[in-house]
Amino acid sequence: MAVDSMTPKERFIAALNGQPVDRPCAASITSVVNFELMDLVGPHFPEANTEPEPMAELAASAHDLMGFDSVMPIFGIAQEATAIGCVVDFSDPDNMPTPQFAPWADRDAEIRLPDGFPDSFFEDKHVKCALDAIRLLKSHFGNKVMILGKVMGPWTLSYHAYNVQEFLMDTIADPDRVRKSLDTLSQVPILFAKAQLEAGADAIVWADHATGDLIRNTMYRDFLLWRHQELVPQVPAPVILHCCGRSLDRIEYFRE
């Protein structure tokens, strides 16, 4: 049966829900940014990671220049890391922002969010940048194009705040400290997701890099599955899980 012509947003939502579409949905839930695109559009890193106007302009090119059905303004995985006490290098024009200092890496460090949280979270420059970029995209596209927000889940945030190697080692050496990290950080993606939806995002990409390249599938089951089951329903919009790397052996857990 033929399907009437759809807007990009209608097409994306229909595809997400397994419903008929007028043509295959073309979209990226993470980022389409590359050097050639930056040269064509104008904005480059680091400004496109730190200033809302360049961020929104570069994100908009996914639809305006390439015809994708969705746009995504948060290009990296460390946008909210400074708001939880990390030091992030945003200066490299050739790379994504990279965490440089993990406040919980010292074993004597107290696992807690910064003083003033959650107000301090929304005062962070890079959090503000992402929210303002979403507002600009909403003003530009209205309800025509799917605007995707993105948050890091507690596992990826733990990589930033705890240090990747130390965190992964402690899944065996000190699992209680790992659980405390996950417990402490679980509120962050909920707050950020809701703020992005209020700013104009239509759905949230939830990035938690519990990949087979780093941990066994049973660790996802034991540490993270039940948290995802509790946290994701608190986001009042469609949520799309993103997990880079080898993940086939945990797909069944993702489905749960």
What are these regions (language model features)?
Residues 107-114:
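Residues forming anionic-ligand binding surfaces in small-molecule and nucleic-acid pockets
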